[in-house]
Amino acid sequence: MANIKSAIKRARQNVKLRQHNASARSMYRTYIKNVLKAVESGDQEAARAAYTKAQPVIDKAANKGLIHKNKAARIKGRLVARLKAMAA
């Protein structure tokens, strides 16, 4: 356990931030899973709607530093590729 006052405060903050980050990470993963489920079911409209909802959540995770911006681009690109493959 930390002895210095500022280190004690940082330890307290880290607990809160870890919980917040875990929640946000879970949320963006859930949105991705919703898109993948819609693609698997074969419903194009539901898949497009799910992707439209997921896109800003993924971008927000990247902007907040939860994931790297390149990873966000890669995830969105893969989802779009699945949507296009489903349409073809």
Swiss-Prot record:
Give the record's GO CC terms: cytosol; small ribosomal subunit
Checking InterPro entries in the record gives: Ribosomal_bS20, Ribosomal_bS20_sf
Any Pfam family from its record, for instance, is Ribosomal_S20p
Query: Can you list the disulfide-bonded cysteine pairs?
Result: none
One Gene Ontology BP term is:
translation
Q: Could you confirm whether the keyword 4Fe-4S appears in this record?
A: no
Please name the SUPFAM superfamilies in this protein's record: Ribosomal protein S20
Q: Name one GO molecular function term.
A: small ribosomal subunit rRNA binding
Task: Give UniProt keywords alphabetically.
Answer: Ribonucleoprotein, Ribosomal protein, RNA-binding, rRNA-binding
Q: Where is the signal peptide?
A: none
Q: Does the keyword Hydrolase apply?
A: no
**What is its biological role?**
Binds directly to 16S ribosomal RNA.
Q: Which family does it belong to?
A: Belongs to the bacterial ribosomal protein bS20 family.
This one is known as Small ribosomal subunit protein bS20
